[in-house]
Amino acid sequence: MGYYSVGIPFLYFKIPFTNSIRLCILYSLIGRTSPIIERKQEKLMLYMGVGDSMGRQKLTIKDINIRLADRGIQIVGEYVNQRTKTVFKCQRAHVWEATPHSILHMRRGCPHCSNNTISLDEVSNRISNIGYTLLSSYTNAKTKLHLRCNNGHDCFITLDGLTQGKRCPYCSLKWENGGFLYIMSFSSGTKVGISLYPEKRLNEVKRESGFSDLYLFTMYHLPDRETALDLEKEVHREYYNKNCGFSNFTGSTEFFNVAPEDIVIFLNSFGLEEYGH
């Protein structure tokens, strides 16, 4: 691999000269473009830390600290660009050097916190600060914690994962084109939940739970996550006293000792129609 000096209004950067970069430069010179080339050009600009192909300005220290606020991390050193190391500080006052890119995009956190045991009170405070509830004991930063998010979803995330920005997998879904309220069932219970991809979710639950005969009974397409969450909560409240009591896998609290047909009848009272029917 060779290197090539790219000039951008009086600034020159020595970067790896790959076929992708060669293609980006050539297309820029002759005025041609395509979605693929635009993405490559954007990555090239981000690599150099001077903005992107859409003309957006590079991030400021204030921008980065706002993005990192819920992780308890902030920049305290000089900021040059995303690929140049600077000094970060965590909420326990540890300082270390890292590139902004590794903190923002690779989700790396404080190396001192990940290697040291912290008190249960401090763990509880970190979790409550993001609106979550701790439902299990704390062993170490790399052992998954049983958590409940502020939307009532049960999930399993390590303390390291929380520090790196991981959150409830249900709440992190993007619902621009709508999503699904689904009903899954097997010989020992029925599960009601929400997902963008119910078939994929079925495989995940089967793998984590070991319920090999679990199957997708039916689903309902909904326009936004808020509507789906409200209906999911209605079902969970209705059958609260019939919860199966499963644990130790994501979605374990969403199983009920109820026939799936009964849940369909309950949802019909909200005027819902089964997807594809």
Curated annotation (Swiss-Prot):
GO terms for molecular function: DNA binding; endonuclease activity. Disulfide bonds: none annotated. Keywords: DNA-binding, Endonuclease, Hydrolase, Late protein, Nuclease. Induction: Expressed in the late phase of the viral replicative cycle. It is an enzyme of class 3 (hydrolase). Pfam families: MUG113 (PF13455). Its EC number is 3.1.-.-. Putative endonuclease. This is Putative endonuclease. It comes from Escherichia phage T5 (Enterobacteria phage T5).
